[in-house]
């Protein structure tokens, strides 16, 4: 009887840890989603955004937030479900990952707002390479602003932890299934939508994709033609300038 009780307690502890992890993952993804939405609001596409483009971006941003949090969740959190004595370590590691991901997302948002591209190797070379202090000047005001934003992100991260611990016991298998379906839908549906939009020249969808970091939307013009979704003669009818690029136009006037 004692052995069975001990075994049931171990199982219950594992289930609670996984429930807490599910809430952590979902809330962390929502936190990152907010930053991705801010990318769009601060971009040049916001003024001309319509409902279709906005809804597409929201779902695509959610899928991207899910994917960004998936690796640290799987690597840093899930393995400790089978290591009872170290579960607090798993929670701490994933908490640090949430914080660092959001700090990086905030810095990336600044870069995207200023330069219209996301953090890449070129930007890192400028920042940390020779003469980087001449390219990026950090005065006292900027440092204080950075500290304030860091504390704000830390506060939101702690709120996520509080929600996970407070409401983990209310998580049901049905809610987990809904979360899985939402994950799959937000990762697959935007890709298929973009494949059609790229062939049908729906610019409200194709252009806003540039706001998402490390996002590589699907294009399948040949497949769309083969399936009869679009006609070959219609590929460039709606947008004769397709392929010339509209995110960056220089010079504004002929020289």
Please place each PLM-identified region on the residue numbering.
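Transmembrane and membrane-interface helices of multi-pass
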Residues: 2-222
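Soluble catalytic regions of membrane-associated enzymes that act on cell-envelope
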Residues: 217-255
């Amino acid at each position: 009887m004692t052995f069975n009780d001990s075994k049931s307690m171990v199982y219950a502890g594992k289930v609670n840890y996984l429930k807490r992890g599910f809430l952590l993952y979902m809330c962390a993804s929502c936190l990152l989603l907010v930053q991705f939405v801010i990318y769009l609001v601060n971009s040049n596409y916001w003024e001309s955004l319509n409902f279709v483009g906005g809804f597409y971006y929201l779902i695509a941003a959610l899928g991207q937030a899910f994917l960004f949090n998936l690796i640290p969740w799987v690597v840093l959190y899930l393995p400790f479900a089978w290591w009872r004595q170290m579960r607090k370590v798993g929670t701490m590691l994933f908490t640090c990952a949430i914080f660092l991901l959001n700090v990086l997302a905030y810095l990336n948002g600044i870069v995207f707002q200023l330069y219209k591209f996301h953090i890449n190797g070129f930007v890192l070379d400028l920042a940390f390479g020779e003469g980087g202090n001449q390219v990026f000047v950090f005065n006292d005001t900027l440092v204080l602003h950075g500290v304030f934003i860091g504390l704000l992100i830390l506060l939101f991260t702690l709120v996520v932890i509080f929600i996970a611990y407070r409401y983990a016991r209310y998580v049901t298998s049905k809610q987990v299934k809904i979360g899985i379906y939402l994950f799959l839908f937000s990762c697959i549906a935007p890709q298929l939508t973009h494949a059609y939009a790229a062939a049908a020249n729906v610019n409200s969808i194709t252009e806003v994709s540039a706001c998402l970091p490390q996002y590589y939307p699907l294009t399948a013009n040949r497949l769309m033609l083969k399936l009869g979704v679009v006609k070959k003669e219609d590929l460039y009818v709606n947008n004769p300038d397709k392929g010339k690029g509209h995110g960056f136009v220089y010079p504004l006037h002929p020289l």
